[in-house]
Amino acid sequence: MSFISSDDSDFRWIDDYSQGKIQLGLGTGDPKFDEFFRYKKEFLIINGHSNVGKTTTALYLIANSAVQHGWKWVIYSSENRTASVKMSLMQFAMDKKVADMTYSERKEAYSWVQEHFTVINNEQVYSYADIILFMEKVMRQQDIDAIFIDPYNSLKLDMKGTNIGVHDYHYEAASEFLTFSKANDIAVWLNCHSGTEAQRRKGPDGLPVAPYAEDTEGGGKFVNRADCFVTIHRKVQSADPNIRKMSEIHVRKVREVETGGAPTPLEDPYCLIMNLSHTGFTTRIGQRALFQPINFLEQAQMPMNINFLG
């Protein structure tokens, strides 16, 4: 009966785990961050308030995965110009503004983006089913490690021919993304807005506090389906300019802790600080970037063959 799990396969996994043979998720470049978050081929949901830099922080983490691990991504960002998304990735890769790059550097950085990222045009509004269909088409043409959908809330509600309500539709969408991730061994990152009530909640300093997972617009159905859940928050109206530059990363849920990662302490998130040029982040502790910027011109220089000199 095919619906029953394989005892042999399950025992093999348990035996491998007991011997420390289960591979951990891929590292971030910072051992402290690795305690809470690792790159895995799983269904990850991000939430946060509007205008706190969710997309920017996520794109930096995405660029990090491409630089350090060679991950290849499909990106659908409906609220940002596709050229702007590519430019951000170029700048993160080189830690340099495009205006400060030479023409050759811009060409090399853009080629790197083309190699690692497929960006879906956002001239139309798509449903979650459309996005899955696009993914299947891209995967038939090339290897893909992950997809970033930004934001989920902008996707079209396509409920034609169904007898379900909006709540069930969103639950079905989350379930479909989870199933797609597992069936294809691919990471699915879903960026979501927080609900209105959560945006009204203030801390002792009078500033909005980070939303919880259940504060996601649409409710707790999203955290229920997610393998990993992350909240990105920034105090954009703080009087302290250093606080305004700091992105808090709250890891709310890690389903499979056996492969690395764990929820961050409630009042002590992991933090990244935007650099002065807005082309990268550094860690709060140690003030170091997660990865070394790529020097495309240095890579392009081939060593001279001097064997002919005898």
Predicted segments with their positions:
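The Walker A/P-loop phosphate-binding site
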Residues: 2-95, 306-309
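C-terminal regions of RecA-like/P-loop NTPase motor modules
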Residues: 2-12, 18, 107-110, 128-144, ...
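Conserved inter-motif catalytic segment of the P-loop NTP-binding fold
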Residues: 28, 69-167, 172, 297, ...
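Generic hydrophobic alpha-helical scaffold/packing signal
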Residues: 34, 47, 59-63, 74, ...
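Short, well-ordered alpha-helix to beta-strand connector turns
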Residues: 41, 116, 226-227
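Hydrophobic/aromatic beta-strand patches that form the interior of the parallel beta-sheet core
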Residues: 44-46, 74-76, 118-120, 189, ...
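Structural recognition of the conserved hydrophobic beta-strand(s) that form the central parallel beta-sheet
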Residues: 75, 148-149, 186-193
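Signature of the SF2 helicase/ATPase Hel1-core->accessory helical subdomain module
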Residues: 154, 193-196
